[in-house]
From Swiss-Prot:
Residues reported in the UniProt entry to bind GTP: 26-33, 105-109, 160-163
Annotated stretches, region: G2: 84-88
PROSITE patterns tied to this protein: G_TR_1 (PS00301), G_TR_2 (PS51722)
UniProt gene name: cysN
Name the record gives this protein: Sulfate adenylyltransferase subunit 1
Protein's organism: Bacteroides thetaiotaomicron (strain ATCC 29148 / DSM 2079 / JCM 5827 / CCUG 10774 / NCTC 10582 / VPI-5482 / E50)
Alphabetical list of InterPro entries matching this protein: CysN_GTP-bd (IPR041757), CysN_II (IPR044138), CysN_NoDQ_III (IPR044139), G_TR_CS (IPR031157), GTP-eEF1A_C (IPR054696), P-loop_NTPase (IPR027417), SO4_adenylTrfase_lsu (IPR011779), T_Tr_GTP-bd_dom (IPR000795)
Cross-referenced PANTHER family: TRANSLATION FACTOR (PTHR23115)
């Protein structure tokens, strides 16, 4: 039959669609979960069994009166449904004719800041909800600050519950003016404001007749058309090596994800930290070879020369190098329920690199509600200074055991971000966004990297290579040793 559904063609077409990752944030009862539920409902992306369950749950535990409680599509935890709030990050996937979406519904409470950081770490766009009755409040400012901290370039201010202010243009303009005045110094390049009613569906999927004064497009139309391709850094080639692939003696490839930039066959690349160069022989994928690769593609690169490269090292263009250093400043969010121990060292995971690190100084803490910088005397950590607690944000100085290869987070999110790992519990203690390198001349005397002087060992020179191989494996596991021949 001519009308028979071609499943392969449908899947191929769906695979070619662009993917937009977005998060929603707002105060309690601003309607985040209701908005996403309405988006799924009106775009006909729910199955019949989901609709039946939604109707049953709305009558049993819903908070929308006689209406369907669309928030129940997102609020999955029992505690969330009982309290009518979002606690965990809820993810939902759906697609339209124009694009695929992954939505992270993040909690609005201050005590769940780490959940919002987690949900927004991969987002291209943020929807900040405000209640038309209350306007821009402290939580709105906090969420917007966190969005700017994460480097999200596109923000939608969704002024919800417009039906409760009679769809007043004057009220909408007042909220927009106040918000744009606040957001301007944060440096978010793309801010759009949409009046809507999530419960009734106004301006969610289709334009509403109840806002004739609004000349923009609906929320879904905006999400389908917002341009995100330029958000990637296509200038600075960075290829953190994740795995060395050697299936046989005739093939040696370096696997990983292109973090930024573009690499082509024949390009000259440099391996860091060795500084050795070679040319790209081939770019291999599961579907065959490519002439070039770009972010966020995962590929295997083969080189014309046999140079020593292992996991944690990086391939770059020799005329465009990242910062190579052990000392840097960063904005850091504390994620562990255990307060920061000033005497503890951590593992730092940055791209595929792993090293030991210590926190040398806290420049200041940030009050996420007022944006105020809370300074710490001389920037030094002492027992008299309260260490970082769960969800607190600070500008810190770190020193790593071995050199890292990084760019500022604002320039390159992939190579400018890191996590700290507690070496005892393996918990993620903190996440960070690198600002820049920092001079640490005053701390040179406290350099605690152990030194191995091969000339002082009673070992034949032919065994030095084996020792260096062991040292390199220790470095790969985050334990640095300086070798002197």
């Amino acid at each position: 039959m001519d009308n028979k559904l071609d499943i392969k063609a449908f899947l191929d077409k769906d695979e070619q669609k662009d993917l937009l990752r977005l998060l929603t944030a707002g105060s309690v009862d601003d309607g985040k979960s209701t908005l996403i539920g309405r988006l799924l409902f009106d775009s006909k992306k729910l199955y019949e069994d989901q609709l039946d369950a939604l109707e049953r749950d709305s009558k049993r535990v819903g908070n929308a009166g006689e209406h369907i409680d669309y928030a129940l599509l997102l609020d999955g935890l029992k505690a969330e449904r009982e309290q009518g709030i979002t606690i965990d990050v809820a993810y939902r996937y759906f697609s339209t004719n124009g694009r695929k979406f992954i939505i992270a519904d993040t909690p609005g409470h201050e005590q769940y800041t780490r959940n919002m950081i987690t949900g927004g770490s991969t987002a291209n766009l943020a929807i900040i909800l405000v209640d038309a009755r209350t306007g821009v409040i402290t939580q709105t400012r906090r969420h917007t600050f966190l969005v700017s901290l994460l480097g999200i370039k596109h923000v939608v201010l969704a002024v919800n519950k417009m039906d409760l202010v009679d769809f007043s243009e004057e009220r909408f303009d007042e909220i927009v003016s106040e918000y744009k005045k606040f957001v301007e110094p944060l440096g978010i390049p793309d801010v759009n404001c949409i009046p809507l009613s999530a419960l009734d569906g106004d301006n969610v999927v289709d334009k509403s007749e109840r806002t004739p004064w609004y000349k923009g497009i609906s929320l879904l139309d905006f999400l389908e058309t917002v341009h995100i391709d330029n958000d990637h850094n296509f200038t600075d080639f960075r290829f953190p090596v994740q795995y060395v692939l050697r299936p046989n003696l005739d093939f040696r490839g370096f696997c990983g994800k292109v973090a930024s930039g573009i690499v082509r066959k024949g390009d000259t690349v440099m391996a860091l930290p060795s500084g050795k160069t070679s040319k790209v022989k081939s770019i291999v994928t599961y579907d065959g070879e490519l002439d070039y690769a770009f972010p966020p593609q995962s590929v295997t690169l083969t080189l014309e020369d046999e140079i020593d490269v292992s996991r944690g090292e990086m391939l770059v263009h020799p005329d465009n190098l990242p910062i190579v250093d052990r000392n840097f400043e960063a904005m850091m969010v504390w994620m562990d329920e255990e307060p920061m121990d000033i005497n503890k060292s951590f593992f730092i995971k940055q791209t595929t690199n792993l090293s030991r690190t210590r926190i040398d100084a806290i420049k200041y803490k940030v009050d996420v509600n007022t944006m105020e910088h809370l300074s710490i005397d001389n920037g030094q950590l002492t027992k008299d200074n309260l260490p970082l607690q769960l969800n607190q944000i600070a500008r810190v100085v770190l020193t790593t055991a071995k050199e890292l290869f990084f760019d500022p987070y604002k320039k390159n999110k992939s190579c400018g971000s890191f996590i700290l790992i507690d070496p005892i519990t393996n918990n993620t203690s903190a996440v960070g966004m690198i600002i820049d390198r920092v001079e640490m001349k005053d701390m040179a005397a406290t350099d605690d990297i152990p030194v191995l002087d091969l000339s002082k060992l009673d070992i034949a020179p032919e065994h030095h290579a084996a020792i260096e191989k062991v040292v390199k494996e220790l470095e790969r596991q985050g334990l640095s040793i300086k070798v002197i021949k």
